[in-house]
């Protein structure tokens, strides 16, 4: 009950302060936007500091691009990321505490950044500035329809390869010129590998008498968090293909016989 009351008070306070301060400031920022900062990059990911945005950020830091560019992250709680505050790197609170209401400061950085990188959609800004570049790093490339027909705004969007261009043209309703088949930064990170990952893989294969490791990350799945649910699956295990225990045992038998670990 106390948690519920606290959340309700936070939401109420966020709404009040938005009406008194943020809303007016946002309107003014949009009407009289400050000058673009030519060397400012802005990052936002669906879950803070993750996905393709995080992988690209790590690469930029590794190569020293933060010496030339200011890199700003929009996150829920900036204090969580103190260890990543390298030279010219800043973490800015995106939402008012305990709410889904964006702060005026988030708009300020969105309206003044020359380059904006994101992984979902950035429609909330409601406008784009001349000479701003909106680059959608996106978060996956499954063959699924754009069910709600929403428009995702960008100047360019990454896809893993040429084979995805046609399907993403249909999904986003854009031309092929806007789709860059450079691959995803997180794929580069995964393929680069690490010594720890190699050691763990060897350990798993040895323990299970396996020769091959398959990492299965189904898009259509049921999750404990409603926000992460992609589809409602009506089967025993809430994952695709494996509808019941018999199919699971059949797959397990096949894997054992062929020394495969999933």
Predicted region positions:
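A short, compositionally biased domain-edge/stem linker segment
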Residues: 22-32, 121-122, 198-203
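Short, flexible helical or helix-coil boundary motifs
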Residues: 20-24, 64, 258
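Active-site and donor-binding regions of nucleotide-sugar-utilizing enzymes
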Residues: 37-193
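Membrane-proximal basic amphipathic "stem/tether" segments
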Residues: 1-38
């Amino acid at each position: 009950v106390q948690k519920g009351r606290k959340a309700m008070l936070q939401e109420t306070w966020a709404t009040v302060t938005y009406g008194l301060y943020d809303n007016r400031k946002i309107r003014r920022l949009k009407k009289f936007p400050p000058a673009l900062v030519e060397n400012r990059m802005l990052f936002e990911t669906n879950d803070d500091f993750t996905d393709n945005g995080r992988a690209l950020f790590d690469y930029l830091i590794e190569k020293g691009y933060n010496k030339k560019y200011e890199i700003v992250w929009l996150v829920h709680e900036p204090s969580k990321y103190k260890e990543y505050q390298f030279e010219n790197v800043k973490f800015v609170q995106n939402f008012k505490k305990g709410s889904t209401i964006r702060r005026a400061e988030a708009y300020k950085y969105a309206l003044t950044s020359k380059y904006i990188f994101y992984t979902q959609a950035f429609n909330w800004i409601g406008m784009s500035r001349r000479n701003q570049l909106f680059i959608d790093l996106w978060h996956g490339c499954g063959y699924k329809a754009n069910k709600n027909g929403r428009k995702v705004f960008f100047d360019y969007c990454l896809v893993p390869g040429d084979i995805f261009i046609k399907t993403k043209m249909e999904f986003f309703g854009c031309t092929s010129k806007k789709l860059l088949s450079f691959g995803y930064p997180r794929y580069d990170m995964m393929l680069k590998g690490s010594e720890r990952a190699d050691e763990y893989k060897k350990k798993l294969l040895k323990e299970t008498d396996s020769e091959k490791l398959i990492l299965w990350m189904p898009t259509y799945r049921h999750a404990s968090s409603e926000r992460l649910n992609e589809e409602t699956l009506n089967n025993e295990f809430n994952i695709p293909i494996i509808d019941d225990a018999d199919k699971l045992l059949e797959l397990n038998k096949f894997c054992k016989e062929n020394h495969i670990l999933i």
